[in-house]
UniProtKB/Swiss-Prot annotation:
Transmembrane segments: none annotated. One of its GO terms (molecular function) is GTPase activator activity. It comes from Mus musculus. The keyword Electron transport does not apply. Residues 164-218, 230-256, 308-343, 421-443, 514-578 are annotated as: Disordered. The modification N-acetylmethionine is found at residue 1. This is StAR-related lipid transfer protein 13. Residues 179-188, 230-245, 421-435, 529-549 have a biased composition (Polar residues).
Length: 1113
């Protein structure tokens, strides 16, 4: 880096070899008299480069993690295989079913990986292949397929379409620079996402202040390099191209270094060459500055920049947008090409427009807001060919125009007119006054642009009389030509006042909040400004949906009785109805006001299969990322869905000594199958039944001693808690403490900040959509507990006249406990805590978070019936993938057709399953992965390669009963060991040992119960005294739905083997989709539920412990 070349024989100074501008600036910061030695300076620069490289590697890892989580695992695989950079345009084509706002987050991550690949970062991600690492098996694009044997993604068609032409023809490791054969800008050859990446401020979760500058500098450097290449003569460009692909292939870093040095040399020569004199020709021309933060509306309005020189030297507008440029000259332009459109200019992002206007002129006629997006590509080319020279254009201003005011009308006359027809743009009000149409020319379309040879711009908010007074001296109205067209405009254009109001809302967004409070925003025929800027808001889930009122549902529930201590159940039809102590809460014990009431056309989260929910979570992450990166300013550059860096992976603590408080929700799921313990559900039931009329519920504090006694009762006797005669305020405070004592907030550590940002930055019109996406990303146990709590709080609000607790009052009281706002975070150092709370006053950030939490929780309480619905537009965008994720339940005829044997029936299929189970037992269940489980049970799982994300689980336990007795207990006496078993019946007996059986399992309120319809058969005459029970779901038209949601039993097998001394070994192999749960929930909790099931069967045979003293016999 440094060459020791003394300036003079006596001076020991050193020359600097050419450094990068960043390195030179860093070096020159030091004082000349006290500069570091060259060796020390090289160490500083090397350390800086190392830090930069590490930061880029972190960005690449976060981008790959996001790609896998959002349903794009194939690109993460390509990056790990060193197959980047890839063509962004091809990626966009692969995902053409996604909206533009949803593609932008993907393009940002891919541009980050392209940049990291150009730096040749050696990033090898060691991903841990855990039990729940099946995320890579889902891709939202149908252009890719997953090879399960090699566990790799492969493209359905040609893979080479993803890579740039330069990378395909040249060396695989060459720099990804493009040169063009003309003198146009390089943006002509770049796709739109690639151009947008130059202006992007986010790169996969990097820090905004430290990385955006580097990214812009690197992108500008690359642009300048290609601009130089495109403006050089052909011979010079060929010489420059030889540095890209020399005959003797050199390493990539060497070619990149030589290219950068050559670029620095050319830049210096070009800068010197411009000042050598006016006679110098053929000098190097560097492109003028490129906007690095071009606003989106600047592109939408299709503005034309007017440079100081000849217009022919600047790239046309369409070229800058990535559209193909026509080679026609101004004399060859067709009538449609000479036309243009006009509309009222948009005032959005005024500051950015002002900065852009400083760089070049802008014609008012080229501002197209409403019609620009609806016109065909030919209208975009009109702006390219409309103005070829400024000398041929004359702009007329009305005589009564006052200086300093905006002109009411403008007229542009061409000194070289052509024969074109006049026309009116019905959408924008632009009037074209040209010569009469010739006989051989066709009539122009209404939506096409008008002739530019003689054109007037008219603004919609100018009265017609005033307009004629201002333009009468400019235009020859011909009295019979224009006025009828103006009448037609007034007849055809409807709702001009609404358009003006819509523009006003766009200019002043605060006006919309007042109009929303005054009336229903859905009545407006025009979308709101936020709906215009975000495409997918146009299909809001709030449109066209009605739900039964709470009053009607409450009226229905008033006649129902609350039975305490007795379990209600309808007659099964198989045996006498049984009652026993109530340890699980039942649907019939609650009002109907808190039950979910989705409309028939609206899918609910609880009815989704695991594969469907897995797919919807990908779309939710993609949609939420698009919304938050657009509006969330504080987290715009660091958006990542990984666990925060301060949370280190530590050993999971042991919760065996805790029953209720301080236990994670997933542990409750593993114990009981429900995220909330039974004692907390009993507390909510008690408050709903007896205390909703208490004034200030959850606001008034209880007595600490009584609350402590309630906590001890819950910990010591969690299954036998009674709240009779307890104070409502004590029970309510205990419920608050339960959520406050959770190891992580109810909204999880990952997404708590996201929920707060939604209510801080996202516009009100899009908050429901953003919250729906965030709720889909919550862990299943957190989402179910949240739904139970919100439905309960909604019931509290329904009696606001008695308890005076509005949604905002409840939110203020409960938000700190649900978000853990006021708790000192463990990641904060003592110095930070001491500095933050030294004055005793919360900082502004804490105040903003508390306000956002209160507003957000109040909104969730009000919209609790809609938060857990699946948006229609998300289902529509998933296309066939959503339908393919549905589980096809076979009929009896389909079961026989699945076998290759001719004439096979469902009996043959069931016999095949029984033989397969016997074979597995004979081979000692080889290939299963064992995992830890409690209560002396053996638990293992095995992945099934049939495309469904659920695993096959196996739980084994020894039972003190012979096989035939255990089989009867499983087959006919489920009510003795399953507390959720509420209803059952035999639909049809097919033979002595085969039947179609239907039963219902209860769920936590307000979630729907699960209905099972299975075909099952059992065998008792197997070798060695074994018994089997095999069942699976079937489609049977005569069986009506008895529960809330029809679950799917893909495989359920019981194997009972004798162990001697009257004992048996019970093995249960199970694979069930309960609906409403993600694959992660099954990986974390379903295996424990299988182990708990066989444990309950074992415990049902244990003899009762006799009370009293022993007697001697």
């Amino acid at each position: 880096m440094f060459s020791q070349v003394p300036r003079t024989p006596a001076a020991g100074c050193y020359y600097l070899n050419p450094l990068t501008p960043e390195s030179q600036e860093m070096y020159l910061r030091f004082d000349q008299t006290a500069r570091r030695s060259p060796y020390r300076m090289s160490r500083i620069l090397a350390r800086h480069h190392l830090v930069t490289k590490i930061q880029q590697e972190i960005e690449a890892k976060e981008a790959c993690d996001w790609l896998r989580a959002a349903g794009f695992p194939q690109y993460a695989q390509l990056y790990e295989d060193s197959q980047f950079p890839i063509n962004i345009a091809a990626v966009k084509k692969d995902h053409d079913f996604l909206e533009r706002d949803l593609v932008e987050p993907l393009c940002r991550r891919l541009n980050t990986l392209n940049k990291c690949a150009s730096m040749r970062l050696d990033v090898n991600f060691q991903r841990k292949k855990g039990d729940d690492s099946d995320e890579e098996d889902l891709c939202i694009s149908n252009k890719w397929t997953f090879q399960r044997t090699s566990r790799r993604w492969s493209r359905v068609d040609d893979l080479h379409t993803l890579f740039p032409v330069a990378d395909r023809n040249g060396s695989p490791g060459g720099p990804r620079m493009r040169n063009t054969a003309s003198s146009e800008s390089v943006l002509t050859d770049l796709s739109e996402p690639e151009v947008c990446s130059i202006h992007s401020e986010s790169s996969g979760g990097s820090d905004s202040r430290s990385q955006s500058g580097h990214h812009s500098a690197d992108s500008t450097h690359a642009l300048e390099a290609t601009l130089v290449s495109s403006s050089l003569p052909q011979s010079t460009r060929e010489g420059l191209n030889q540095s890209f692909h020399p005959k003797n292939e050199k390493p990539t870093r060497t070619r990149a270094k030589s290219f950068l040095k050559r670029m620095d040399t050319l830049r210096v020569k070009g800068a010197l060459g411009r000042h050598k004199g006016p006679g110098r020709t053929g000098g190097l021309v560097i492109s003028r500055p490129v906007l690095q933060q071009e606003p989106e509306s600047f592109k939408t309005m299709q503005c034309v920049q007017i440079p100081n020189g000849d217009l022919q030297t600047s790239p046309p507008a369409a070229c800058r947008k990535g559209l193909p440029c026509s080679s026609k000259s101004s004399g060859e332009s067709s009538p449609l090409e000479n036309s243009s459109t006009v509309s009222t200019p948009c005032m959005k992002e005024r500051k950015c427009h002002h900065e852009a206007n400083k760089r070049g002129g802008m014609y008012l006629e080229d501002l197209d807001v409403l019609a620009g997006t609806a016109l065909p590509d030919t209208s975009d080319q009109n702006h390219m060919h409309g103005f070829h020279s400024q000398e041929n254009l004359v702009v007329h201003i009305p005589k009564d125009h006052k200086p300093g005011t905006f002109p009411k009308a403008l007229s542009i006359e061409s000194l070289s007119p052509t024969d074109n027809s006049n026309g009116v743009n019905w959408r924008t009000g632009s009037i074209s006054l040209g010569r009469q149409q010739g006989p051989g020319m066709r009539e122009p379309r209404l939506m096409s642009s008008c002739h530019r040879a003689s054109r007037v711009s008219i603004y919609d908010n100018v009265p017609s009389s005033h307009l004629y007074a201002s333009t009468g001296d400019l235009l020859d109205l011909e009295k019979d030509g224009l006025l009828p067209q103006l009448d037609d405009i007034l007849q055809h254009v409807n709702g001009i006042q609404e358009v003006v109001d819509d523009w006003s809302k766009n200019i002043l967004p605060e006006l919309q909040s007042h109009s929303t409070l005054a009336g229903d925003p859905g009545l407006s025929p025009f979308p709101s400004p936020n709906q215009v800027t975000l495409d997918f808001e146009g299909n809001s889930v709030s449109e066209g949906r009605t739900t039964p009122s709470d009053v009607e549902r409450d009226r229905t529930s008033l006649n129902e009785s609350e039975a305490t201590g007795v379990r209600e159940r309808r007659d099964s039809g198989v045996g006498a109805s049984l009652t026993r102590p109530n340890r699980r809460l039942r649907w019939s014990s609650f009002q109907l006001s808190h039950q979910p009431q989705p409309s028939p056309a609206t899918p609910h989260i609880s009815s989704q299969t695991a594969a469907q929910l897995n797919l919807l979570q990908r779309f939710s992450l993609l949609r939420l990322t698009a919304i938050m990166e657009k509006y969330s300013m504080s987290n715009k550059h660091g958006w990542t869905w990984s666990v925060p860096k301060f949370m280190k992976r530590i050993k999971a603590p042991d919760y065996r000594d805790k029953a209720v408080f301080g236990v994670p929700l997933i542990v409750h799921v593993q114990r009981t199958g429900q995220p909330l313990p039974q004692s907390i559900q009993q507390a909510l039931r008690y408050l709903r039944s007896n205390c909703l009329d208490q004034v200030g519920l959850f606001r008034k504090s209880g007595v600490k001693s009584r609350i402590h006694a309630l906590r001890q009762m819950n910990e010591n006797f969690p299954d036998n808690v009674s709240y009779e005669d307890q104070s409502a305020y004590d029970v309510a405070d205990m419920v608050k403490q339960f959520f406050r004592d959770l190891p992580e907030p109810l909204f999880t550590n990952k997404l708590s900040e996201t929920f707060l940002h939604i209510y801080q930055y996202v516009p009100k019109e899009q908050r429901l959509q953003a919250v729906q996406a965030a709720i889909l990303l919550l862990a299943d146990e957190n989402r179910e507990a949240l739904q139970t709590l919100l439905c309960f709080l909604h019931d509290v609000v329904n009696l606001v006249d008695e308890n005076q607790m509005t949604p905002m009052n409840l939110a203020v009281c409960l938000a700190p406990s649900l978000f853990h706002l006021n708790l000192l975070k463990k990641e904060s150092s003592p110095k930070v805590i001491q500095k933050k709370y030294a004055t005793g006053k919360p900082d502004q950030k804490d105040l903003n978070e508390n306000l956002a939490a209160a507003q957000g929780l109040a909104h969730m309480i009000t919209e609790c019936n809609r938060l857990f619905e699946v948006p229609h537009e998300m289902v529509a965008q998933s296309r066939d993938s959503y339908l393919e994720a549905e589980i096809h339940v076979p009929s009896l005829e389909d079961l026989g057709a699945q076998l290759a044997e001719s004439g096979a029936t469902f009996h043959t299929y069931l016999e095949h399953l029984v033989q397969g189970l016997q074979k597995e037992a004979k081979e000692k269940f080889k290939g299963w992965v064992t995992c830890s489980s409690p209560d002396n049970t053996d638990l293992a799982f095995k992945k099934v390669g049939d495309g469904h994300p659920l695993k096959l689980w196996k739980a084994s336990v020894e039972v003190e009963a012979p096989p035939s007795v255990v089989l009867n207990r499983v087959l006919r006496e489920r009510h003795l060991w399953d507390e959720d078993f509420v209803q059952w019946k035999v639909v049809e007996r097919l033979d002595k040992q085969t039947e179609i059986y239907q039963y219902v399992l209860n769920s936590m309120v307000p979630h729907p119960s699960r209905d099972f319809l299975v075909l099952r058969t059992w065998k008792t005459d197997l070798p060695k005294g074994m018994c089997t029970l095999v069942s699976l779901s079937v489609e049977y038209e005569e069986a009506q739905l008895m529960g809330g949601v029809r679950a799917v039993v893909m495989d359920s097998q019981y194997l009972i083997e004798p162990c001697g001394s009257g004992k048996s070994r019970l093995t249960h192999i199970c694979r069930i989709d309960l609906k409403g749960h993600s694959p992660e929930w099954y990986s974390k909790g379903f295996g424990h539920l299988c182990a708990a099931e066989v444990t309950r069967i074992r415990n049902s045979f244990q003899p009762l412990v006799a009370e009293g003293p022993e007697t001697k016999i």
